[in-house]
């Protein structure tokens, strides 16, 4: 697969720079950190902002959902790697003058570990930040073990619904409950028809035959239900 890349070690920063320039009417970099994208029109300080930290490589998730009625900020990590707890905490601190902050966390081990670390750092500074763990992928855990499911494309419903409501409501607990309701009523199932290619190494993320599809694969190539032949 052909890709237009300048230097591999700058790929994420170049991508973000291009995105911000292309959508400068809606988003901008945080003043001192080019891995934090924020909306141009700031939310009223009486309202609760929504923040997410996630690895790059899933675009337009989540940077494409930063804007009015959506997410207030996205802390971006390397490809398929969550930003560190310190980096996410840096994003949280941008909103410490608000009555509360919701940190959206997609249910993947690195995202959860680093997100919870950021919440702990916020607690130490008496910043009212609360996590909302998001999951929807039915291939990763059975009914009755929903909290073990991975986050997938269904998380975008939370971005939009909670983002719109957060422009109206000021109570963080009510917003958390709404986010949980959206999450608990969302299910997704992915189908992979070909492998992604690492822009760094040029290697395939997984192998799949031309006459196969993979049902239930995770967003990083994690295993799902299995392969199935197609005509």
Identify the residue ranges that each predicted region occupies.
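N-terminal amphipathic/basic leader segments beginning at the initiator methionine
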Residues: 1-50, 207-210
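Gly-rich Lys/Arg/Thr-decorated short loops/hinges at beta-loop-alpha junctions or inter-strand turns
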Residues: 44-53, 62-75, 139-142, 212-229
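Short glycine-rich or small-residue beta-strand-to-loop segments that form or flank ligand, phosphate
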Residues: 48-55, 71-74, 100-109, 116-119, ...
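Glycine-rich oxoanion-binding loops at beta->alpha junctions
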Residues: 58, 67-98, 231
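Short glycine/serine/threonine-rich phosphate/pyrophosphate-binding segments
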Residues: 59-61, 85-89, 110-116, 140-142
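A glycine- and small-aliphatic-rich helix-loop capping segment at beta-alpha/alpha-beta transitions
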Residues: 65-73, 118-128, 149
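Short, acidic/small-residue loops that bind anionic groups at enzyme active sites
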Residues: 74-79, 123-145
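Internal, active-site/partner-interface "lid" segment
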Residues: 140-150, 159-222
């Amino acid at each position: 697969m052909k890709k237009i890349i300048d230097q591999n070690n700058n790929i994420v920063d170049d991508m973000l720079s291009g995105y911000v320039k292309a959508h400068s009417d809606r988003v901008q970099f945080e003043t001192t950190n080019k891995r934090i994208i924020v909306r141009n029109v700031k939310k009223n300080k009486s309202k609760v902002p929504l923040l997410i930290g996630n690895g790059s490589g899933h675009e337009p998730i989540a940077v494409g959902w930063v804007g009015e009625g959506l997410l207030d900020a996205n802390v971006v990590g390397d490809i398929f790697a969550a930003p560190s707890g310190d980096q996410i905490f840096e994003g949280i601190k941008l909103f410490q003058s608000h009555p509360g902050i919701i940190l959206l966390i997609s249910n993947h081990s690195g995202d959860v570990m680093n997100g919870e670390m950021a919440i702990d750092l916020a607690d130490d500074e008496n910043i009212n930040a609360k996590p909302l763990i998001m999951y929807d992928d039915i291939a990763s855990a059975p009914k009755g073990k929903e909290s073990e499911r991975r986050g997938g494309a269904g998380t975008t419903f939370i971005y939009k619904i909670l983002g719109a409501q957060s422009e109206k409501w000021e109570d963080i607990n009510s917003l958390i409950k709404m986010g949980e309701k959206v999450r608990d009523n969302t299910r997704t199932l992915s189908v992979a028809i070909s492998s992604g290619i690492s822009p760094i190494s040029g290697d395939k993320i997984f192998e799949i035959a031309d006459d196969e599809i993979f049902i239930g694969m995770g967003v990083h190539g994690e295993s799902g239900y299995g392969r199935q032949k197609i005509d």
